[in-house]
Amino acid sequence: PQFVFSLFSVFGWCCMRLLHGHRNWGKLLGLVVGAVAFFCFIYGFTEGFPKMQVKRITIYVPNLPKSFEGYRIVQFSDIHLGSYYGWRGHLPQRDIDSINAEKPDLICFTGDLQNVTPDELPEYQALLSSLKARDGVMSVLGNHDYTYYMDVDDEQEIAALEKRMQDFQRSCGWRLLMNEHVAVHRGADSIYVAGTENYDKPKRTNVRKALYGIRPGSFVLMLQHIPKQWRETWPSIINKEKDEDGDVIGPDRKDSLVVAPQLTLSGHTHAGQVSVLGLRPSMFTPYDYGLFEEEGCQLYTTSGLGGTVPIRIGATAEIVVITLKRK
């Protein structure tokens, strides 16, 4: 608010000098706008951040096996457990209860469990272990789940900290996908769930490795933390050695073709955390929020549940209930 007031005050002074006026109306305008900004931020911290919605979408895909008609997936993302201190401490319990109440076939977590360090996690082990779905919980790592935001240079310490995060997720009964895939079966039918490591800072992703060995014609659900990586999975790009930006996709077998995922789930952007009249900080980020489709592939980017800075205005936190239907 003080910055807003100062900005308008300087603007008003310039106008006063140019127009030879006697009153700096910028100060009054700055006072009003600054007061509005102050109350908006108070609202975002106290009322906006705790809000959570259950969003339901139906996604139609052409090659879904009959046994998976109506298959229900709950996606949650970016919970940032280090932000739930003090009066916010009850929110993770509410979120997990909401997920379990949906009785999904599969739960998918698309990254950023911690803010900075795995020290934030142990008190939530019992809670996260209570997530229940017929086919379990599958997860990928987000950029905050590595050591990029820690002041650590020793390679052994970095490896140990990252292993703690990975071991924690596995200790909760989650299936952590690190450039790999698993099959989910219903009788003779099956679908595949693949997941990649982080796309940037640090860059550990290998899309082709995650998909290698999946039968052609199979339905594939891909979990990727950062939505802009979705482009690497398009049919026109996925079997090239480099993507459209010239970055190496990372084929392990150059003589093998891999299947393009029909559906990708991502997070990372938090939908900007602040959205006013459709304007949000993340709007210039590719695929920052919502459902997208290109080349027969679909992406859903969720607004997530938390954030390193606990504030939300008009970008409500969410869990997403996805029902798969045959096209």
For the regions a protein language model found, what residue spans apply to each?
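Hydrophobic alpha-helical transmembrane segments in integral membrane proteins
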Residues: L31, A37-P65, S83-H90
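Soluble catalytic domains of enzymes that build or remodel membrane lipids, polysaccharides, and related
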Residues: K66-K327
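Generic structural motif
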Residues: V10, R17, P62-L64, K327
